[in-house]
Amino acid sequence: SRLAELEMSEAQLVTLASIVQAEAREVTEMPSISAVYHNRLRDGWLLQADPTVLYALGGPRSRLLYAAIDSVADSPYNTYSQRGLPPGPIGAPGEAAIDAALHPTQEDFMYFVARPDGSHHFTRTLAEHNRAKADARRAWDRLAAGIDGSDGSSPDPR
């Protein structure tokens, strides 16, 4: 079965799909977001999924700061401090998110950041990711200043 190929239980798949659902703004990006998390799990990395920390904090925040992440460091849902998937779903995933969790893109993406338009910039290396984050900060700062910079070319700092 596909779950056996992925070395995941049904519960783990639903948990991963719930993270993909919470992270994605565009359904077309779900398989790429899923690939990042599958790749991180495969390589033993922390997932570092913002939606899981927001879940641990009890809900949305306008911005996720390191102090907030640290405040729930011991939570099993804090994927910045706890390895692997959290113990359960953080929401109800839709069919597209479940399909993306089952069938991630075959890319070696390890990182992504959100752009002001809600789409994501996917990268393979830390150097690429750091450049994307720097671009993101500038784009979000322009947006906060009321300067139209939401052309989709700059990602959101996460």
Regions found by a protein language model. Give the residues of each.
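Bacterial extracytoplasmic/cell-wall-associated proteins, especially those involved in peptidoglycan
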Residues: 1-158
